[in-house]
Amino acid sequence: LQVVMNGLGSIAGLRQLALPALGGDLWAQDSLPDLATADIANAGLLKAVRALSFVVRDGVTMAVDYRNIGAEEIGGVYESLLELIPEVTDDATGFELSIAPGNERKTSGSYYTHPDLVQSLLDTALDPVLAEAMKKPDPEKAILSLKVCDPACGSGAFLIAAAHRMAKRLATVRTGDDEPSPDSVRSALRDIVGHCLYGVDMNPLAVELCKVNLWMEAMDKGKPLSFLDHRIMLGNSLLGTAPALMAKGIPDEAFAPLEGDDKAVCSVLRKRNREERDTETMFLVAEGDTPGRPFAVYDTEEFGSAIEQLDAMDDNQMVSIEQKRWRYRAMSGSREYGAARLAADAWCAAFVWRKVKGAPAAVTRDVFRRINEDPQSVPGEIIEEVRRIAEQHSFFHWHIAYPDVFHLPAPGDDPDNELMGWSGGFDVVLGNPPWERIKIQEKEWFATRDPAIAGAPTAAARRRLIEQLRDEDLRLYDMFTQDLRKASGDSHFVRNSGRYPLCGRGDINTYTVFAETMRNLISSRGRVGVVVPSGIATDDTTKVFFQDIMEKRSLVSLYDFENRKGIFPAIDSRIKFSLVTMAGSGSAERKPADFVFFALRAGDLKDPD
């Protein structure tokens, strides 16, 4: 097995066994270093391979057909894995996977999307963009230049569905046939996967499964797996900054007290931040400069050029894939790239900093300026704390992660997106983001850690049991309070960072801020296609957002569904959800929005009655 794995992961393959060089993280020896030198008896390995290769149904043993496994099946596996919690056996010789009470699909807020819903969103969000590309003088180049993103990509169902539709159009352009051959579509699919798709998820398992899913779909005989490290990324799509926000410095609202903070320390920091801003203003006035001068923001143009050069490289040979990997690691590991990320991380960290006596000095306006201009001038403990917080909260800064998509406007020019301060954006943003509140759900949190607390008959009883942990299990109590603080910090950021002026209010649900994020990620001529609860149009907390998309004629369509037919079997049948499509401010089509209500299945959308 090691010979096969090493052969597939090598640059040259293994000619003796007719194994091609596929590359990718699947066979890299450093992907699972703990297992690289582990020993296993042949009998145990055979048992594992047999379990993966065969299933028994009605007493009949059948081989698993991995060649024809689709995105839906892998998505179902992903959703099932989210429910399972590994529990090490008492003798530490193995582990079992079990579903803890209260953990069924709730720990992630994720639900696999029915393919019919995905296809419907592609009709309204992707097809119009593809149609515009087909009208270009060079439609092949135009299609390959499209950028499609899912900011909560999971196992990649939306990206794969989009890739297949784009690949067929690309193959049609290349061959001139309305129904291109499977080989031409497969070749086009590999090009689409390697050049057009972007995805982000905060679950490491999802990121890896998404890559594997894309690789399986786009495998082309004799060619290595596409390089995807710069496309499919790990991070929290909702927690990050943007050039326009950083240019304003640290707002006073950043220093509101969170769970465990000292209110007196918070007041001191808020006052210090305000005084630093006032002192700076007085100095600028004295020097004849403009008060409120924006902070300098790292220009990511150089990084964007590096990514574009990387994408232009041939990827049909394993040597080229390795060169891409080396170049990307060199760029992302460079001092300049690290400084840009550090400044963005520091801005976000100010909102969730530990504000107690004895903690490292907080990132106030002056500290942020010093980090932005010369990180070496800042005490090391502050830099270390910024990095710790950034890792804990999985900060993700879109303009730094994807510098080929977002860029700063030229001096004197206005950005396409004034709120974010950038130009550019994705052509299409798709997805079914999590539907969950940004705060700790005690029942779900304790489901895998202390089932007795999770199973308490009432919320009051549960809180009493939690308080008893102070004396009975201080370690678990500290873990809970730390996660409670993290959730409090995430909510505070969403409400007060300025990134969510429309949805950062009330009892915030992640689907609302995802909808606002997705809208800000598209270019002026881009489109959003998203699955969200129908409360996006009816809830009090989203009325400002919905009013804005109506007034600006951003809404293309809203198709409302009832779940009575179990489209989402894991949620209540009374839940209503919608397929929402929005267009950018420069969209060529500005027709009145299309509405459908009380649909039960995707086929109802085509019913004239």
Where are these regions (language model features)?
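Glycine- and acidic
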Residues: D58-Y66, L97-T113, I143-C153, D191-V200, ...
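Flexible phosphate/Mg2+-sensing switch loops adjacent to catalytic phosphate-binding sites
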Residues: A133-L144, M166-H195, A218-R231
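Residue-level recognition of alpha-helical structural elements
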Residues: D299, K324, R329-S332, E336, ...
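Preference for the N-terminal adenyl/adenosyl cofactor-binding alpha/beta module
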Residues: L1-A167, V200-A206, G235-L238, G338-D450, ...
